[in-house]
Amino acid sequence: MIKKAGAAFMGASVMGIPAFGQDNANNVSTNGKKKKLVVVGAHPDDPESCCGGTMLAFRNAGCEVVSIYMTKGEAGIKGKTHDESAAIRVKEATNACKVLDVKPVFLTQIDGSCEITKERYTEMKEAIAAEKPDIVITHWPIDSHPDHRVCSSLVYDAWRRLGYTFELYYMEAMTGLQSQSFFPTDY
């Protein structure tokens, strides 16, 4: 389940792709060209657990899909050092991407210490611009996890700075009450 961003306000709901994410080439192409989907998550496993089915549907329809991870999951495993956790989580994410036939891209933020700075805005904008997406999906901005909020803000800013050149959608973190006030507009 996802929610589309509006150009005027981050939470504005506008009409999205009909039957978004279904395995239907008519919904994932423009003028005969397959759309490129980029999913941006704060941590390894966020893209897959939040919208892995949508990613797979786009791949099955012949579209290129990229998963951008803002961190390497350094704080993701209790009892492990940041380096140990990162090595495990990167391997898991890379393996998940192989299963889904998705390209992984890892950025340089640190899990649990994500920040919004000029340099981080630039890093996110450049990573997204390099992929030339038609559609980007990222975290809903009203989320109890601070890394998810940072990720959402950086992606939203990239959308603006790149001149609204791609459709922006938000995904819900399926962990209970983590995503707040999220009402999907597309499925």
How would you label these PLM feature ranges?
Residues T81-V90, V105-E131:
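Catalytic-core regions of hydrolytic enzymes
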Residues A75-L100:
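Glycine-rich phosphate-binding loop and adjoining beta1-alpha1-beta2 segment
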Residues G73-K80, S113, G176-Q180:
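A short acidic, helix-capping loop that chelates divalent metal ions and anchors anionic groups
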Residues L37-P44, E48-H82:
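ATP-dependent adenylation/pyrophosphate-handling site
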Residues V65, P104, F166-L168:
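Hydrophobic anchor at the start of a short beta-strand
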Residues K3-G11, G21-V40, E115-Y187:
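Metal-dependent de-N-acetylase/amidase catalytic core
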Residues D45, T71, A93, P104, ...:
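Divalent metal-coordination and catalytic microenvironments
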Residues M70, C97-G112:
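A conserved beta-strand->alpha-helix junction
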